[in-house]
Structure formats: C-alpha cells, structure tokens
Amino acid sequence: MMKKKLFFLLVFSCLVTAACAGQETPPETQKSDIPDTQEAESLGAEDVELSGNQVQEPAEESEAGNVENYEGVPYRLYPTSENAWVGDVMPMADENGLQLYYLYDTDHNGVGYHPIYKFSTSNFYEYQDDGLVILYGSSAEEPDLAIGTGSVLKAQDGRYHCFYTGHNDTFPDKGLDKECVMHAVSEDNISWTKIPEDTFYAAEHYSGDDFRDPFVFWNEDEQCYWLLIAAHDEKLGGIVARYTSTDLSKWTLCDPLYAPEKQYMLECPDLFRMGDYYYLFYSWDRVTYYAMSNSIYGPFAEPADNILDGTGFCFYAAKTAEFEGKRYLCGWMGRKSEPKDTGAYDWAGSMVIHELVQKEDGTLGVKEPSSLENYFVVDKTPAVMGTAGDVEKDNGVYRLSAGADDVALAEFGMREPTMLLECTVSLDRDGYAGFAFGAGDDYGKYTGLVLDAKNNSVHFEGCVLSRIAYVEPVISTHFTFEPGKEYHIKLIMENEIAVLYIDDTKALSNRIYKSVDGAVHWGIFANNTEAAFRDIVVKVPAAE
C-alpha cells in the first residue's frame, strides 16, 4: 500500500472540535465521599467537586489546572525511526528473531520515497533498528521511484527474497502502468540485489495504477510458490489476485483468491493457517479486516465482526508472522499533523503489534504480546487521590454511579510514563464507563477512553467526559456489552500511546496527547450507568 502525496495536504481537526464546542452544558455533577465498608483508610486527598462543568470546548483546548511536568521515556514497545515514521509493516520470522521490514516515511519526502527499513525483536520490548534494507530507484525512469508494500521470505533455495511494489507517479503520463511487482534477493538478509528482469505488470483486465502489495509464500501441498496481489479488476472491483511459480521468477496468473465486490481495493493481503482455518487479512479505507475459510482455496467469508482494532488509521495495513509458536498481527498507528486529541490520524506513525487469539468458533481476537509479562514486573498500584460524584469502594471494588447528566470519577494521581493497567469492568445498563485523563483535581476537564454499552463500542473522542454522549468519536471499534457482565481490560501506555485490550477479543490503539501535556493524572469514570471496577493493578518496568 502506498501513501498518496495528498495526505500531506490534509488538515483534519475542525469538525470534531466544532462538535465538542457546540453542546449544551449539562447540570453540575455533585461531590461525594468514598466510604470503604471493610476498613477506614486514608484516601490520600480530600474529595473535591467535579469542577469545570461550564467548559464547552474539547479537553485538549481547555486550560489545564495544576499542571505537572511529564517526563517522557524512549519508545520501547511502539518503535519508530528517529526523524521518520513507520509505514506498512512486512513481518518475517527466522532463526534470528522477528524481522520487521517497513516503509520508511518522512514529512519531507522527495521525488523518490518510501525505502524499506527494518527493526528486529525477540521479545516485543527490545527492538533493534537495523536501518536501510532496499532503497527506492535513483531516477524518474525507474519503476520503483517510490516503494510500496511487499513481503519477505526465506525460500527453498536458502536465500531471502523480497517482493515489493514499484510505484512511479510519472509513468501514466508516459503511457506506462503506475505500479508493478519487483524482486530483490539477499544471501544474508543484510545486502540486497534487485533483479529488474523479474519485474512484471498487471494483466489486461487489472488496473495498472492499482497493482500492489505482493505477498509470497511456499504452498507445501502444491509444491510451488503462491503470490497474492492487491488488484483492481475492471468488473469485480477490489480483489486479491493469485499467481503461482516454481522459481520465484516467472509467474502464472490464476483465478482471484478473494473477490467480495465491496471495496475498491483489498490492500496488503496476508494469508495464513491457524488450526483448522485459513485467514486472509487485508486493509482499505483506514481499517484492517479479515476473512476466513476452511480451505486455502476458499471461499473466504467475513465473520460478523471482522475488525480487530479501530478505525481511522489507528491500526492499518496489518500483516502477520508466526514467531515461537504464536501468530502476531503487525501494523502501524498513524501520527497526527498536530498533537491534538480531536485530530484525525495521518498515514504512518508507530509500529503496533498484537498477538492473535483463536476463539472456539474459529474467529480471531487480539491480546498484548504474552512476553510483556516479563517487562511489566514492578507493582505500582496507586491509592485513590480524589473523587467526584457517587463513588464507593468495597473490598477492592470501586462502584461508580451516575445519571445521564452526571459523571462519577475516582482519580489515582499521576500516570506512569510506561504502565500496564489491568482490571475487570462491568456496567449495569446502557451507559458509559472507562478511563479518564486530566490535570490534577480539575475533574470537569478530564477526557476519557470510553467503554460504551449504549452503542456497543470502545472509542475515544478527546472531549470532556460530560460530552461523550454527544460527540462523534475520533476512533472506535465495535464490542458488544451485556449488562452486569465482567470484562477483562488491559491498558498499555507508553508516553501518549494508549492501547486498550478487552477480553482478548478487541484492541483500540490510540494516542492521548493530553495525558502527556499537562493532564497527566488518570482515573476511572462512569456516566449514565453504574460501573464496577475490580482488581485494579498497575505495573511498570523495572528500573534500568
């Protein structure tokens, strides 16, 4: 998948900002004490009123009270290159670990752009920056003046092979196809040699401007290589085209593997087997999807909910690799042109990796990489620092109750720069609960990461808690909530990045800039529901 240059011209935040500012102010939320029926304990701060209810602007544009300095940390969980951004990821595992090739994107791309760079890891919290792998073409006459997504494999001949997209915006003016499939080889996965004679273009009934993202693998049953390509068929629309080869040089066109006749393109296709099912991942319109089948030949069908993370470039172009017996889904979370919580995500940003979980019915879920339990080893579970609204604590369970015009909140002090928050949450009716971020005791200006039982979703909009019922989310993902049912939550934060996992089923990858820019306190909240938060634990990495 290629980033189009028009992305550099987009500015996103106006509509959501206006929506945040234009709602009627709800009644003031009242203060309450937080009795503990098991023991009399100090809560570390006096209860304070939920102030700031006259504020109508979004949280990140409101004035922060009691601002405290936040000291950031290096990105160890969600890497990106210095002075650049991570674009489409092309994962491949070998005896040296998980090799994470990616499109290297900058804000100052020249005529040529998107070389392939690489990170590598064996534990998902220590990444080695291996630098440049394949450079784009050196002249406007070369088909890979820009490079698009591809794949890397260690083939039957013992060599490493990279198939990638050649993209040249000037070619259509010369009567040539804009995109093609190109081939490079390496003996050591360090030095690469391009093979120009292996370059090939789209078949006649496929668009020459949309022929990209080659994915190559060895099919043991057929004793040949399969090549999947994101293509646009003149009759079927977006398809996953299929080719076969015995030598990785000459390719034979076969019938499409998947043609749902829904999207214009099915970018970044990725096919693998897990258990009794085959899974096909693809991306379009800022979202990563998957389909599944009992056979590698299909037919592939979308499950009822085939999105594992959020919308809007918060997790895109994801492809998979198996490493040490587990399958990982590797994509990127977009950056924003301005660090505003209400702003939209742009193309390319930070690498995000989820571990895939197979459910009993064959559908997939996601969780954090299991190895992170070796990273978050120090308990830093905090005490309550303050509350607002109807909050009670009983034997380690926080019960928050609020009406439609109220917010209940328990605040736990300053967040850790890198932290794992784990708990279970239940909601008794169709309302809102979740995790709040703000400046000290200025609770009226807190913003929230929302578990939305009314609309069956998890989302973030960057506005004050009293506005969450009225504002369109910046990003969201579907999740069905049942009244009274407990859900297991893990929230991993590293600087402004916050990735929430729920029940090993869904993730929402997100950037909460306000949580590192003055509003560095965190808490839990409820609105128009009674919510119970149990077994809250916070862990951080060991000091280095």
Where are these regions (language model features)?
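C-terminal motif of bacterial Sec signal peptides marking the signal peptidase cleavage site
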Residues: 16-19
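Short tryptophan-centered beta-strand motifs in secreted/extracellular beta-sheet-rich domains
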Residues: 271, 421-423, 485-502
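Beta-rich carbohydrate-recognition and catalytic domains
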Residues: 21-23, 27, 47, 52-213, ...
